[in-house]
């Protein structure tokens, strides 16, 4: 299942999250902040300064697929045309493309 971990919001509030609650993380270049999309489909903005390297250390199920995206592989259904398709009700998410830089790591990790 994975250990609960703590993230900080921009207002310095601490938010406890369980890996199963996290569908994916998205980097907002405009704000220069990561946000986490939860299984409730609500986004939680993370404090500035958080890096992808820090995020993927929270759980082995968090995998970076693009400079701006980290997914929870437990929600991954299929990769089609370099696009991650998630299990319902997240099958309408269309933004999760796997970049060339991260594709090899993803394939190696899952023996694809």
Region locations from a protein language model:
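Basic, polyanion-interacting recognition surfaces, primarily
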Residues: 2-112
């Amino acid at each position: 299942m994975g250990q609960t971990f703590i993230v900080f919001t921009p207002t310095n509030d601490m938010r406890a999250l369980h890996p199963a609650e996290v569908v994916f993380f998205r980097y907002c270049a405009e704000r220069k902040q990561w946000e986490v999309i939860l299984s409730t489909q609500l986004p939680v903005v993370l404090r500035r300064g958080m890096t992808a390297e820090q995020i993927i250390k929270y759980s082995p199920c968090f995998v970076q697929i693009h400079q701006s995206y980290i997914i929870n592989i437990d929600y991954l259904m299929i990769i089609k045309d370099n696009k991650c398709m998630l299990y319902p009700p997240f099958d309408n998410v269309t933004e999760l493309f796997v970049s060339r830089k991260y594709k090899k790591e993803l394939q190696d990790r899952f023996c694809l």
